[in-house]
């Protein structure tokens, strides 16, 4: 290109060409190469514009690092009736629970061993229970025969009649007697006094134990260790709380056990255990909000031992459910109030 010649700016790219492609002095191979570069640039630019337009069409919401907080703020503007009910009653419910907990931990029976007189009465009760069974297997007949050889104290029958013993106790003792070789009264006494030393392992064993036994304060000193308590809380959170809320076959017994588990949960716990409790609280809250509580439906009842301790349910508490009590206790006593806010 001659020194005096100039090039008009490119209509698309807005730049002046470095030299005229029509100039005869330019190598034809260079011209072809530059044309291919131009076509590639045009194609790339067109794709970029198209993608940008598509992205604009798809974009409905621009993400923010504060999205979670924004959603939380929106939720707070629409509080469910079940959450309002919790907020209004939580302090009253937890205050009542704390008084019940103090009563159980202070006054409930805690087994420390049998006196001779008490053991004789238990043997007599067991003998009468076995004799009243409509059908008896060979093992039961043998146990009765062994017990008949024992010399019971005078007036033992009268005292035995006044002794309040749950037949469930006799059933459990019989199960263990059937697994033991019984040749003398001492063998029977040993089964009674040593208690059930079998350590429960896994979901099925614990489930069978809970549905077949009334919860008692002493159980948390004999059978349920501090470590096993947290295993039970996990089982409650994962499965049993659903059974309770939907009023399944064993919901009454499981409800009673949940009440006792809450009573025996330590007041000070580690961050790990707080997280386990929080999971249970969240599960309860989720169930409550899915199926709002109606008046007189699923209202809490007192386990047998609590009733015997003269624990009362005041009017302000009588329509509360165990799921509501659970989330309330976790929220207030374990610093998880955000669950109900």
Curated annotation (Swiss-Prot):
On the tree of life, the source organism's domain of life is: Eukaryota
Tell where it localizes: Nucleus
Give one GO molecular function term. snRNA binding
Keywords, alphabetical:
mRNA processing, mRNA splicing, Nucleus, Spliceosome
What does the entry list under GO cellular component?
small nuclear ribonucleoprotein complex; spliceosomal complex
Q: What is its main location?
A: nucleus
Q: Which Pfam families does UniProt cross-reference here?
A: SIP1 (PF04938)
- Where along the sequence do coiled-coil regions lie? none
A Gene Ontology biological process annotation? spliceosomal snRNP assembly
Q: What does this protein do?
A: Involved in mRNA splicing. Required for snRNA accumulation and manufacture of snRNPs.
Q: Please tell me what else the database record remarks about this protein.
A: Present with 1870 molecules/cell in log phase SD medium.
Stated family: Belongs to the BRR1 family.
Assembly description: Interacts with HTA1 and associates with the spliceosome.
Q: What is this protein called?
A: Pre-mRNA-splicing factor BRR1
Q: Which organism is it from?
A: Saccharomyces cerevisiae (strain ATCC 204508 / S288c) (Baker's yeast)
Recite the lineage of the species: Eukaryota, Fungi, Dikarya, Ascomycota, Saccharomycotina
What gene does the UniProt entry assign to this protein? BRR1
């Amino acid at each position: 290109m001659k020194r005096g010649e100039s090039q008009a700016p490119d209509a698309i790219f807005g730049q002046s060409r470095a030299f005229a492609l029509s100039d005869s002095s330019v190598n034809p191979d260079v011209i072809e190469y530059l044309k291919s570069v131009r076509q590639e640039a045009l194609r790339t630019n067109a794709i970029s514009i198209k993608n940008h337009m598509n992205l604009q069409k798809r974009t409905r919401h621009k993400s923010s690092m504060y999205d979670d907080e924004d959603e939380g703020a929106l939720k707070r503007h629409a509080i469910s009736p079940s959450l309002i009910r919790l907020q209004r009653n939580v302090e009253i419910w937890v205050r009542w629970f704390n008084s019940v907990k103090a009563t159980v931990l202070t006054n409930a029976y805690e087994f420390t061993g049998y006196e001779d007189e008490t053991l004789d009465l238990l043997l007599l009760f067991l003998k009468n229970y076995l004799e009243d069974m409509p059908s008896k297997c060979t093992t039961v007949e043998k146990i009765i025969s062994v017990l008949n050889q024992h010399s019971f104290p005078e007036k033992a029958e009268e005292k035995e009649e006044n002794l309040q013993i749950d037949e469930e106790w006799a059933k459990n003792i019989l199960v263990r007697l059937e697994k033991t070789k019984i040749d003398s009264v001492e063998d029977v006494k040993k089964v009674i006094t040593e208690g059930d030393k079998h350590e429960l392992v896994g979901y099925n064993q614990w489930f069978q134990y809970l549905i077949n036994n009334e919860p008692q304060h002493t159980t948390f000193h004999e059978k349920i260790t501090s470590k096993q308590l947290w295993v039970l809380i996990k089982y409650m959170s994962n499965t049993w709380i659903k059974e309770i809320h939907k009023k399944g076959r064993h919901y009454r017994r499981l409800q009673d056990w949940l009440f006792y588990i809450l009573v025996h949960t330590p007041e000070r716990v580690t961050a790990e255990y707080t997280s386990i409790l929080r999971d249970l609280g969240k599960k309860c809250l989720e169930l409550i909000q899915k199926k709002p509580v109606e008046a007189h439906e699923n209202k809490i009842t007192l386990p047998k031992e609590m009733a015997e301790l003269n624990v009362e349910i005041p009017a302000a508490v009588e329509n509360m459910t165990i799921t509501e009590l659970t989330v309330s206790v976790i929220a207030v006593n374990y610093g998880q109030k955000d669950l109900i806010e």
